[in-house]
Amino acid sequence: FGKYFDDRGVVLQTENEGVAHFAQKLYRRCGVQGTVISKERPTGPVYEFSVKDPDEVAKMLALFGHTGKEPTLRIRPENFKCQNCMQAFIATAFLCCGTMTDPEKSYNLEFLSTRHYLSQQLEAMLAEHNFHPHRALRKGANTIYIKAADHIEDLLTFMGAGGAAMRIMDQRMYNEMR
């Protein structure tokens, strides 16, 4: 769900410097070296973790069971050894391409991707865990979204963001009491 993942390497962009350095740390644990750089944008800095060195790219592709020449990128279920792997994958996908509205205004969590098959597979993974996702095409991007507050709370908890789930629960109770 990054900017790209192919024989050129991988690029993950985020507004959170800690997320970029965490990606670097995880790849390093797997034996793949990458770099983090900061790019200034009018809206603020964007941090980019990348693996571009050809030797490191080869290691990365082998690690994930890809050649880098696939016509369409797919999620490979065999890469998930346990439930924690699935949870970490979905959480990382959210960090790469997810957004969530302010719960004071509405309840909406989205994953956006230009990759059609990848989006379909993510939707299926979320449905398999009863998060009740929906899919739409918006401005050329595949959007997987969840609108029900209770499903958003469950997904956030599943991804390890229990504090964010509790804030939504608190806001929902506040809204219901008004």
PLM regions with names:
Residues V36-R41, H134-R138:
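Short beta-strand
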Residues P42-E56, G140-A149:
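A generic structural motif
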